[in-house]
Amino acid sequence: MERDGCAGGGSRGGEGGRAPREGPAGNGRDRGRSHAAEAPGDPQAAASLLAPMDVGEEPLEKAARARTAKDPNTYKVLSLVLSVCVLTTILGCIFGLKPSCAKEVKSCKGRCFERTFGNCRCDAACVELGNCCLDYQETCIEPEHIWTCNKFRCGEKRLTRSLCACSDDCKDKGDCCINYSSVCQGEKSWVEEPCESINEPQCPAGFETPPTLLFSLDGFRAEYLHTWGGLLPVISKLKKCGTYTKNMRPVYPTKTFPNHYSIVTGLYPESHGIIDNKMYDPKMNASFSLKSKEKFNPEWYKGEPIWVTAKYQGLKSGTFFWPGSDVEINGIFPDIYKMYNGSVPFEERILAVLQWLQLPKDERPHFYTLYLEEPDSSGHSYGPVSSEVIKALQRVDGMVGMLMDGLKELNLHRCLNLILISDHGMEQGSCKKYIYLNKYLGDVKNIKVIYGPAARLRPSDVPDKYYSFNYEGIARNLSCREPNQHFKPYLKHFLPKRLHFAKSDRIEPLTFYLDPQWQLALNPSERKYCGSGFHGSDNVFSNMQALFVGYGPGFKHGIEADTFENIEVYNLMCDLLNLTPAPNNGTHGSLNHLLKNPVYTPKHPKEVHPLVQCPFTRNPRDNLGCSCNPSILPIEDFQTQFNLTVAEEKIIKHETLPYGRPRVLQKENTICLLSQHQFMSGYSQDILMPLWTSYTVDRNDSFSTEDFSNCLYQDFRIPLSPVHKCSFYKNNTKVSYGFLSPPQLNKNSSGIYSEALLTTNIVPMYQSFQVIWRYFHDTLLRKYAEERNGVNVVSGPVFDFDYDGRCDSLENLRQKRRVIRNQEILIPTHFFIVLTSCKDTSQTPLHCENLDTLAFILPHRTDNSESCVHGKHDSSWVEELLMLHRARITDVEHITGLSFYQQRKEPVSDILKLKTHLPTFSQED
């Protein structure tokens, strides 16, 4: 280091100052002038030194005379000469070299950890000495901790401990920081470039098909991008340039592990087994948590994650963290995977994936995952509305930018298909919005509660009492305890079917549904925290909605799609990778509208059992034990009234089935089509009731106020059964009946009330449910018809005794018949209603371009404790109950074995998009 400093730089000082080289003191041949310079303060000496030299003297003689003279001033002159030389050297250094030396010591650039000395130092000792150069930290220390270039680092001397390089040779070495080109070479970063529509994949040599990257930002609430998008330039550009949905609906419960595993399997938690971050399996007698070794037991993981699908079909996968990816599922790990370690820097994860993308073709994965814990971690700690969450959002936006810049460096930014996604949203917690069951139950020592917004309850003594515990008694004890109660206890088979949270032994038989922002625990000591962020609530709540952005050559450019569920993403990724999906809960083809070139063309399922005829019979009229009001128009001549011509039947079909007849996909049921003037039915001769009934209500249709509760007419097209008689239901406190097509509906001025009073239009119905059914038909149906300019209605019974969301087989139904009054009767578990209208309310249901739907799957219960109806008017709770139990058309199809809209002309993929839509409402904000 000495050679660089001014103190040891005499030779460089001479070069810097001109006077020492050119002055007389350096010229030994000009002795007189030299002496004069050495003794300028002595007049006599000066005079003698300036006297002309006697050129006639020989040098030797002159020298001899000088030696003998021994002038005493000689030593003074020599001293002065030496002083002048030293002074000249110093001045030369100061005035001639000062700029050069100062320039060297102001910066550590090129000097990091070298033991040189100067005005400032750049070795490790400078910190203790307090004389580090001003840029020591940025130039020498930060490169060990940061993954990017900045102006301090551009052109740096290569440092062995830096995470990436910004030196001039980094491109040759292949270790440049991701942003080297934009920061140090003036090129534009990915986010600075304009949007471009990538019509065809533009891939480097060796990439036969575009790779797919699934990138999760845990806990990224959909609303974050709506509110803070201006602070998130990279994600906002992906949204603008790619395919985006304002909300992606997670699965219930809205927790991390269940949702991440649903995304990669296309299955609901009840199907793939990961029903929560914490759970107990009574058959395994084992408990699962994210911090236990049990997490690595493959027995917990059902279904087929996409890296297993890829492996089966000859593709490779690389996962840098994803729930389940570090577990040997079906005997398979991803080809490259990392054991989860939350301390691994985000940048290291991104660089690893970029390095995997550079592997040789035969080693390189086709499918990749990335996972970041933010903004979930900050949301939990500080709440969703906090400066810390904003910082976390900006941080992950920078990470996405790092990825995109890295892809650009590899020329993969027009090749790779990116899915940027999150698992769920985030809600603000409050200690005042926590419910404790010990307040209601007293002694709770024998009870275990999994706390949170989707709480569950089981006995402490497991597995012995897991199945025999009195869950129903506790549910009854906790129902309707307070006005405006913010939680509802549910036996799991009564939960809204849209949640798909029942068919698993890992889901305790007793669960709790909570209002937005509310949580539940056994007592205050059993919950972790109450005032920070949380998630897990109903998956339709606005603050639980998740992020989805698709970008790359496989996705459409610059579109915003309607909300869809994350179970659809598995099929989407399979399409991007040209894989055949494993069986799953998604609807393959429902996201075709996101893709530029869909590879899968869906088709309507075929009806597996043809319709049979229900001919008129000449059986004698039977006494049904009914008492009809004389004002009701009776059916005098049944055959005349219902023996319709082909032309009449065509008109009726057009008016009652404008979108086609529901196809029956149940293999065993014998179904015949019954046509009436105002409605049509698909009647099952096996279960003695209609599977469906369809009719249309116009905006101006009138409804009668007549009471039809004890009036039936025999339908001579169907053999009469005791369950079709009024006498069977009279004074029966357990069960009554209801009409599928409402007798109150009067579409003609002359009135044809009696058609809806046929024995083939009734279904067994609990009296408590009749309250809901009547209010819907008398009040809500008219309201919806007015709001939507008419609606088509299809309704019918549901049988889901094993609560798996699928229609039960006829064999199972035979085992579920109940005996009432010595007569077998099959009582539905639910009833469904499908309302279809036009998106454009200036159109009528019979002439729709684009359809709008609203469907319900209503639990058929013996009481209305779910709604705490005591002292309430029907108007205050029935519609709220319907909205809680709304469902997708797809959910209705699965649970009934029916298929809708098969006669619509638009592509089947558009029909599937309609069927998988679930309406949302403002009260869930």
From Swiss-Prot:
Changing residue 538 to H: In GACI1; loss of nucleotide phosphodiesterase activity; no effect on localization to plasma membrane. At low concentrations of ATP, a phosphorylated intermediate is formed which inhibits further hydrolysis. Residues 98-925 are extracellular. GO terms for molecular function: 3',5'-cyclic-AMP phosphodiesterase activity; 3'-phosphoadenosine 5'-phosphosulfate binding; ATP binding; ATP diphosphatase activity; calcium ion binding; cyclic-GMP-AMP hydrolase activity; dinucleotide phosphatase activity; exonuclease activity. It catalyses: Hydrolytically removes 5'-nucleotides successively from the 3'-hydroxy termini of 3'-hydroxy-terminated oligonucleotides; a ribonucleoside 5'-triphosphate + H2O = a ribonucleoside 5'-phosphate + diphosphate + H(+); ATP + H2O = AMP + diphosphate + H(+); UTP + H2O = UMP + diphosphate + H(+). Residues 104-144, 145-189 form the SMB domain. Residues 1-43 are annotated as: Disordered. Changing residue 276 to N: In GACI1; uncertain significance. Changing residue 133 to R: In COLED; impaired homodimerization. PROSITE patterns: SMB_1, SMB_2. The record marks 915 as: Essential for catalytic activity. Glycans are attached at residues 179, 285, 341, 477, 585, 643, 700, 731, 748. Residues 597-647 are annotated as: Linker. One of its GO terms (cellular component) is cell surface. Keywords: Biomineralization, Calcium, Cell membrane, Diabetes mellitus, Disease variant, Disulfide bond, Glycoprotein, Hydrolase, Membrane, Metal-binding, Obesity, Phosphoprotein, Repeat, Secreted, Signal-anchor, Transmembrane, Transmembrane helix, Zinc. Changing residue 305 to T: In GACI1; loss of nucleotide phosphodiesterase activity; no effect on localization to plasma membrane. Autophosphorylated as part of the catalytic cycle of phosphodiesterase/pyrophosphatase activity. Disulfide bonds join 108-122, 112-140, 120-133, 126-132, 149-166, 154-184, 164-177, 170-176, 195-241, 203-415, 431-530, 480-868, 614-672, 626-726, 628-711, 838-848. Coiled coil: none annotated. Changing residue 668 to K: No effect on nucleotide phosphodiesterase activity; no effect on localization to plasma membrane. Gene3D superfamilies: 4.10.410.20, Alkaline Phosphatase, subunit A (3.40.720.10), Extracellular Endonuclease, subunit A (3.40.570.10). The chain crosses the membrane at residues 77-97. Residues 191-591 are annotated as: Phosphodiesterase. Belongs to the nucleotide pyrophosphatase/phosphodiesterase family. Nucleotide pyrophosphatase that generates diphosphate (PPi) and functions in bone mineralization and soft tissue calcification by regulating pyrophosphate levels. PPi inhibits bone mineralization and soft tissue calcification by binding to nascent hydroxyapatite crystals, thereby preventing further growth of these crystals. Preferentially hydrolyzes ATP, but can also hydrolyze other nucleoside 5' triphosphates such as GTP, CTP and UTP to their corresponding monophosphates with release of pyrophosphate, as well as diadenosine polyphosphates, and also 3',5'-cAMP to AMP. This is Ectonucleotide pyrophosphatase/phosphodiesterase family member 1. It comes from Homo sapiens. The gene is ENPP1.
